Swiss-Prot record:
A Pfam family of this chain: S-AdoMet_synt_M
Amino-acid positions noted as binding Mg(2+) in the UniProt annotation, renumbered to this chain: 19
HAMAP family reported for this sequence: S_AdoMet_synth1
Binding site for ATP: 17, 177-179, 244-245, 253, 259-260, 276, 280
Organism name: Bacillus licheniformis (strain ATCC 14580 / DSM 13 / JCM 2505 / CCUG 7422 / NBRC 12200 / NCIMB 9375 / NCTC 10341 / NRRL NRS-1264 / Gibson 46)
Name of this chain's protein: S-adenosylmethionine synthase
Bilayer-spanning residue ranges: none
Cofactor note: Binds 2 divalent ions per subunit.
Summary of subunit composition and partner proteins: Homotetramer; dimer of dimers.
Amino acid sequence: MSKNRRLFTSESVTEGHPDKICDQISDSILDEILKKDPNARVACETSVTTGLVLVSGEITTSTYVDIPKTVRETIKEIGYTRAKYGFDAETCAVLTSIDEQSPDIAMGVDQALEAREGAMSDAEIEAIGAGDQGLMFGFACNETKELMPLPISLAHKLSRRLTEVRKEEILPYLRPDGKTQVTVEYDENNKPIRIDTIVISTQHHPEISLEQIQRNLKEHVINPVVPKELIDENTKYFINPTGRFVIGGPQGDAGLTGRKIIVDTYGGYARHGGGAFSGKDATKVDRSAAYAARYVAKNIVAAGLADSCEVQLAYAIGVAQPVSISIDTFGTGKASEETLIEVVRKNFDLRPAGIIKMLDLRRPIYKQTAAYGHFGRLDLDLPWERTDKADQLKKDALGE
């Protein structure tokens, strides 16, 4: 490898990974609540281990949701349907411990600082403050048609395919837990040129040989997903490199909501503010502002204003206006970063209620994002993935 070239690696996990089970349960509960009460406040955390699910958090709503039923349906859909897996939708225990949102937090969200001080009327959308302080990042680049970094894009596609061949019984001996990882080589111009390494670990039936798993996964998972032009004779494959992966899922490792935040976003290619997404309604800026930051970054790249763009937003609890907006185009910008911030402020309402309105976030759309990434999802119609602002941004930034 030339000294001016570099390697970058990202990973993904399947929907049967213990942490991802938790993300999907938390977002399933959120969606069930939002179907009946779009204004509910939800912060739902899930933990799983052998034979046990614990759902906890703060939920303020006018509706009733059968949480154990929602939990079991989600686990069944993922594929944990047999007691010998050590975790089974029918027989696992489901414990719940739910409180209401703290009134101190609710006060800040219900009516933003600016509205409480009389600067805005109660009727305006600015009357919702941020549910917490924090910083969030959004990113986009032109490496793929979905404007995502190539390593995480391929890792997600491999994980999705791993689940497809299991559920469609193309490889019926597979079990739900699995992980993928892709290492991409970049040239001196930071363009992806080849795949250096592919790693796949998949849970399986105990009677299947490692050789069969390796052969089947190359044929049915890797070859249909990975572009042939990026593979060469030096590409390395590590398929179940420990040799055996029978005990998996919550029996193998305990899982928690919010422990796959890099898988959920950009695979480490961009910075992360630390806040998780799943189980949180849109008044939580950890989620909604991260979606908005992606929306901004993607439209900047789609407009041709940069090849690569990272957007940072930051908030104070109870305050509607972001305390800061920062944009980094890594030397690829066609306009100055000051100009980009100016046109972003003009074209995007980045106050929490503005984000909710702009992206229509009070809908039950979250469970589908809880596995295989929240961004770059060509299989879903997610509002923060639209590029409907690109033309206006280009016009405002370049005067075209």
